[in-house]
Amino acid sequence: MKKKIYIAGCGGMLGEAFHKCFGSTYELKCTDIDVNETWLSYLDFRDYESYLRDVSEFKSDYLFHLGAYTDLEFCELNQDDTYATNTLAVENAVYISNKLNIPLLYISTAGIFDGAKDTFDDWDLPNPMGHYARSKYAGEIFVQNNVDRHLICRAGWMMGSGPKKDKKFVQKIMKQLKY
């Protein structure tokens, strides 16, 4: 019997990569607020009761929380939405992980560092610049302090999946060049 992974916020580039990577060896439930693939089902992970119910009914062995607003310009202009999604919703994942006694994987960002050095390691102190980085770092702190079994991964620049999923800087430039 395959182990089960519940992946919240799976509609972006990283989620698609996780689906491809883990789909053959694990039973997956992939959710997102933007159902843009046939293998996704709807979930707003900011809604604790819905999130808890969905993970519980799936009987997950692991909880992966990928979801976040990652468009830096959006995050700077929409601070309340950014913190509700990137910080407060992470608290939902923590509570669910603890309640169901399952490990939590939380995706953060290498952007929690200020760029003052060429390379950073695990012993460098974060100095997030901007609301996106601060909201993700606040999520990290909450996970570290409140879940025994957790893994925090700090992703860097991701590119790929084409214009449908890539909302980052490079794709924005490409879009502007087309006009």
Spans of features found by a protein language model:
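Rossmann-fold cofactor-recognition segment
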Residues: 33-49
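NAD(P)H-binding glycine-rich loop region in Rossmannoid oxidoreductase-like domains
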Residues: 45-85
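NAD(P)-dependent short-chain dehydrogenase/reductase
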Residues: 141-179
